[in-house]
Amino acid sequence: MILHIAITTLLASMSACSYEMDPVLTQRDWDGTATYFQSADEHGFSMYYKPQVGFVGDPMPFYDPVAKDFKVMYLQDYRPNPEATYHPIFGVATKDGATYESLGELIPCGGRDEQDAAIGTGGTIYNPVDKLYYTFYTGNKFKPSSDQNAQVVMVATSPDFKTWTKNRTFYLKGDTYGYDKNDFRDPFLFQTEDGVYHMLIATRKNGKGHIAEFTSTDLKEWASAGTFMTMMWDRFYECPDVFKMGDWWYLVYSEQASFMRKVQYFKGRTLEELKATTANDAGIWPDNREGMLDSRAFYAGKTASDGTNRYIWGWCPTRAGNDNGNVGDVEPEWAGNLVAQRLIQHEDGTLTLGVPDAIDRKYTSAQEVKVMAKDGNVTESGKTYTLAEGASVIFNRLKVHNKISFTVKASSNADRFGISFVRGTDSKSWYSIHVNADEGKANFEKDGDNAKYLFDNKFNIPSDNEYRVTIYSDQSVCVTYINDQLSFTNRIYQMQKNPWSLCCYKGEITVSDVQVSTY
């Protein structure tokens, strides 16, 4: 009886306080506030992949004709890395660039005194004759002596893409062919219609950047074919990737120079026309933005095609101290999250990047969009907002994974607007993507106190001043797309679980069809 009374009393007590602990009420209160919240990335990224431990560096995508999926090898970056033996090759498998299966470590680093103590990026190809996968990669020597090669191209093979065997008799050295022995790396493989295999290697010759070419009929014996392409001026093209898409040949590469640090491309209707784009520093650019495909927050991009779509995988860097503004002449931290995008080929052969369909399809849960605060002259009509110069609208908190879409109609091609994140009603500073039509680019900037420009990406401004904007985020990684003309990858810490806003910096804009969804 005493026990029964005690239990009854306890249940009554719990019932009395259940209102205060009600998770629905807590959620309601949370949604009803718009002040800044110090959020943090969760342990796992589900779409812009990151391993449970460490980070993704220099992806090496390959379409597997046997398994009928994409295999994306990458350099595993531990923090901290061992002094001498670092960046083993790990891998993931994906059908669509939206979900990944970890393959774990595939090719380990060599020993401290071996040529591949540290591993650099490379490329994979399948040989249907011997039914082996071949991965050619860069072997980085630890503290090479003056008579040793700092970088050598090496190879490992596998019958099943699981168990790999290094060929300890294959060492392709640059100085054997008149190239630099310390810059001889990033091998890339492709096969032409005549059945010949081509290997391209980023290197230098007499101090100038070159892409060396080697050819083979069996992937075992290789012959030098001289220089495939020279590099413009004093620039150096990392992670070269050559492919044919429709009627055009392309070279996609990552510009190493600190002032650039972007993925770019050249094009030609034939391989010879492609090679001529940089010959004698010709600078025959493919478009009006020197072939820039994304911002400096998308690097080491390489492509693979399943015969229908061609995707590009690069990494979005982390930033020291989780500081969105910690961007110097070069990204302060190497490696980050794996980001997949889709190549869009336009009628004139130019390329831009778009979202893979499978990523777009992930966001199936529509969210209510609520105005939490307004500043300046804002006219609201249903879900359409007209913002005069200096006006802004703050919307309710985002989730962890977000798809944001809306259409902006500007009054002229001189108008300037932006999308801001980590912007609470009490925030002193926040981070924004500024769309500057008069300059033909989008900027990533810190707004509010201690405002500053961080970096930008150019794109073709619409002649009708209408911008169809879609933003995809997975925790702190987000990619903004505008009109199939702009791809703008960014790392924005704390954007999840915080309010966001639309702003008009110059002129007048009308924003319609604002939608947010999650998964």
Please provide the spans of the model-predicted regions.
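Beta-rich carbohydrate-recognition and catalytic domains
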Residues: 18-186, 190-234, 244-294, 316-376, ...
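Short tryptophan-centered beta-strand motifs in secreted/extracellular beta-sheet-rich domains
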Residues: 242, 404-406, 465-482
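C-terminal motif of bacterial Sec signal peptides marking the signal peptidase cleavage site
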Residues: 13-16
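Flexible glycan-contacting loops in extracellular carbohydrate-active proteins
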Residues: 489-510
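Secretory/extracellular carbohydrate-interaction modules
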Residues: 383-444
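Exposed low-complexity, polar/acidic, P/S/T/G-rich flexible segments that act as propeptides
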Residues: 338-340, 506-519
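Short, aromatic/His-centered strand-loop micro-motif at the edge of beta-sheets
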Residues: 447-468
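Surface beta-strand/loop "capping" patches
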Residues: 350, 354-410
